[in-house]
């Protein structure tokens, strides 16, 4: 230890020691070359030029005793009288808190450009020749930093300099002793640094927080000639424009070479002030992979099917979230412009109705449509590693589009057809000063809530949203398996939307450039049968008037529309029948449980009701529950559900054939296909009516068995018709039959064909 004191005493008197310490270069980042370790003026870090003759190096040794453990500690202090501004203390306006000179620099990669050098002319340092082991040394600066000359700037400052690491270039035998940090009351301590200041806190007696900044441990011969000390704090995930705040438990940044530590210790009052000022600031986490990210990456590498499911879930999220953003734009139009029409008397009521007349209906429809999309796609928000590669809830987005297609066509067709007139009116409003100020005021309001900048960019949103629907559906179809039950609905809704867009596009003028549908639908290969028939170069071209007057194409278009309507109805009927069977089975189960409870109650009071009667009732309910649902399920699958599935496949193939055909299909073939589908559909409906009648007749017979004989005879005498008895037990039976008959009439193609 005496040898170490002598070596360091000789080093403290040597100016070359500080020059060597000042010019140690920052560690080279991974993937960089030596050219990146340029001179200090090119390096993106702060230089604090410290003259070699204005510091003193003092050594002290103390024993820290904690219980039975005694540890000898040695430290070296570099004393200086430099002063600066304490931003945190000044911000808190605490007159009792002195200003302590922060010394800091920032790693080069956290600055955008240039180096930052503090001038030597604004500061001067005094030399403290006292080398005794004291806890603090008070120095009075020879010159005030800046233009402020107040007595409270006199502040003690102490720089703790541990011993240098062993290195061939420095020949220093000491090793690096790490400075550990203490946790604060809330378990965290923060590193505070401004653009050019790094404030560290340390107190050996008061156990205050200590923050250390690493000094780079590499150097070059050229840089050893410079006289500067660079203090580099190297947090892993901070910005240079904000204060550097890091939790105390963050691992210290280490390099291959040993680094020295230059710590700034302040007094207890400033430590408390800074700790109080920084407790409300959020801590910045380090760069580390979370467990969820690691688990997700492992699952994606193990099971490739997860990637497809995750992509599909993200697309469904995109559809729902963009619909919410579109709804927000519609609300912005209504709030910023539509409801303020009465404030401007210069607006023509007819023009205002043309521009904003459809916004209310669009807003009402979009609110309901977004709610249905969110409920249908809710399962995509829970697609994670725990799901068995399927959505937790069914996603019937295609069916929702099919059910809303009529409203979409009715609302958006009129809105799109009036776009030319709407933009002409908006242009006219901006040319007049009275209406221009009203529009500009609305533009300022709307910019606070949306990304749009004016009325024109908001008016075009419905057209853009209509074009977005088929694009999103196409992406969802691409990641939906062929065997999925949702794929036919998605494909059909995509085709119907494309046809709707093509029909709207035919009414648009070519000169209409904003939100034009022309370029979009032409990029689609199957946008319309008429466009495909005329786009074939091998066939002679015909005009649109000739196509409209062609009776064969009109009939083909009508048959295509009828097939699509029938497909949607049959799809809904298939789902309804499955739900009906589940309801019937549940009803019999509930009936059996009720009778079982009554049997148990009768056993408690056998004198009121014979136990055998309740046992007979329970047995009858059990027979009905066990036999009737099984018989219904067999008949339902063989006579109804399977035929409906076959009809849906045939209709889908016919629709795709008509859309993809580049020639006019003969009317006789279409009539034959329509007749076959209609007969099969009628057969399915009649089978379902027969199953319902058989079920409720057996249901009624069972209840007649439970009714006493005298009451049974009176009921039969009054009704005189067994069908009325069935109707009495199940009123909804005949209502369902009437609805099915009306459904058959609406789907029938006999009158049209």
UniProtKB/Swiss-Prot annotation:
<dbReference type="GO" id="GO:0051286">
    <property type="term" value="C:cell tip"/>
</dbReference>
<feature type="compositionally biased region" description="Polar residues">
    <location>
        <begin position="94"/>
        <end position="105"/>
    </location>
</feature>
<dbReference type="GO" id="GO:0110085">
    <property type="term" value="C:mitotic actomyosin contractile ring"/>
</dbReference>
<keyword id="KW-0132">Cell division</keyword>
<dbReference type="InterPro" id="IPR000219">
    <property type="entry name" value="DH_dom"/>
</dbReference>
<dbReference type="GO" id="GO:0045806">
    <property type="term" value="P:negative regulation of endocytosis"/>
</dbReference>
<comment type="subunit">
    <text>Interacts with cdc42.</text>
</comment>
<dbReference type="GO" id="GO:0000917">
    <property type="term" value="P:division septum assembly"/>
</dbReference>
<dbReference type="GO" id="GO:0005737">
    <property type="term" value="C:cytoplasm"/>
</dbReference>
<dbReference type="GO" id="GO:0005085">
    <property type="term" value="F:guanyl-nucleotide exchange factor activity"/>
</dbReference>
<feature type="compositionally biased region" description="Polar residues">
    <location>
        <begin position="181"/>
        <end position="191"/>
    </location>
</feature>
<keyword id="KW-0717">Septation</keyword>
<dbReference type="GO" id="GO:0005829">
    <property type="term" value="C:cytosol"/>
</dbReference>
<feature type="compositionally biased region" description="Polar residues">
    <location>
        <begin position="200"/>
        <end position="220"/>
    </location>
</feature>
<protein>
    <recommendedName>
        <fullName>Rho guanine nucleotide exchange factor gef1</fullName>
    </recommendedName>
</protein>
<dbReference type="GO" id="GO:0061645">
    <property type="term" value="C:endocytic patch"/>
</dbReference>
<dbReference type="GO" id="GO:0031097">
    <property type="term" value="C:medial cortex"/>
</dbReference>
<feature type="domain" description="DH">
    <location>
        <begin position="311"/>
        <end position="507"/>
    </location>
</feature>
<keyword id="KW-0344">Guanine-nucleotide releasing factor</keyword>
<comment type="function">
    <text>Has a role in the control of cell polarity and cytokinesis. Involved in bipolar growth, via modulation of cdc42-shk1-orb6 signaling, and septum formation. Stimulates guanine nucleotide exchange of cdc42.</text>
</comment>
<dbReference type="GO" id="GO:0061245">
    <property type="term" value="P:establishment or maintenance of bipolar cell polarity"/>
</dbReference>
<dbReference type="GO" id="GO:0051285">
    <property type="term" value="C:cell cortex of cell tip"/>
</dbReference>
<dbReference type="GO" id="GO:2000114">
    <property type="term" value="P:regulation of establishment of cell polarity"/>
</dbReference>
<dbReference type="GO" id="GO:2000100">
    <property type="term" value="P:regulation of establishment or maintenance of bipolar cell polarity regulating cell shape"/>
</dbReference>
<dbReference type="GO" id="GO:0032153">
    <property type="term" value="C:cell division site"/>
</dbReference>
<feature type="region of interest" description="Disordered">
    <location>
        <begin position="52"/>
        <end position="150"/>
    </location>
</feature>
<feature type="compositionally biased region" description="Low complexity">
    <location>
        <begin position="230"/>
        <end position="245"/>
    </location>
</feature>
<dbReference type="InterPro" id="IPR051492">
    <property type="entry name" value="Dynamin-Rho_GEF"/>
</dbReference>
<dbReference type="GO" id="GO:0031991">
    <property type="term" value="P:regulation of actomyosin contractile ring contraction"/>
</dbReference>
<dbReference type="GO" id="GO:1903473">
    <property type="term" value="P:positive regulation of mitotic actomyosin contractile ring contraction"/>
</dbReference>
<keyword id="KW-0963">Cytoplasm</keyword>
<dbReference type="InterPro" id="IPR035899">
    <property type="entry name" value="DBL_dom_sf"/>
</dbReference>
<dbReference type="GO" id="GO:0000935">
    <property type="term" value="C:division septum"/>
</dbReference>
<feature type="region of interest" description="Disordered">
    <location>
        <begin position="175"/>
        <end position="194"/>
    </location>
</feature>
<dbReference type="GO" id="GO:1902716">
    <property type="term" value="C:cell cortex of growing cell tip"/>
</dbReference>
<feature type="compositionally biased region" description="Polar residues">
    <location>
        <begin position="114"/>
        <end position="141"/>
    </location>
</feature>
<feature type="region of interest" description="Disordered">
    <location>
        <begin position="200"/>
        <end position="245"/>
    </location>
</feature>
<dbReference type="Pfam" id="PF00621">
    <property type="entry name" value="RhoGEF"/>
</dbReference>
<dbReference type="GO" id="GO:0051519">
    <property type="term" value="P:activation of bipolar cell growth"/>
</dbReference>
<keyword id="KW-0131">Cell cycle</keyword>
<dbReference type="GO" id="GO:0032955">
    <property type="term" value="P:regulation of division septum assembly"/>
</dbReference>
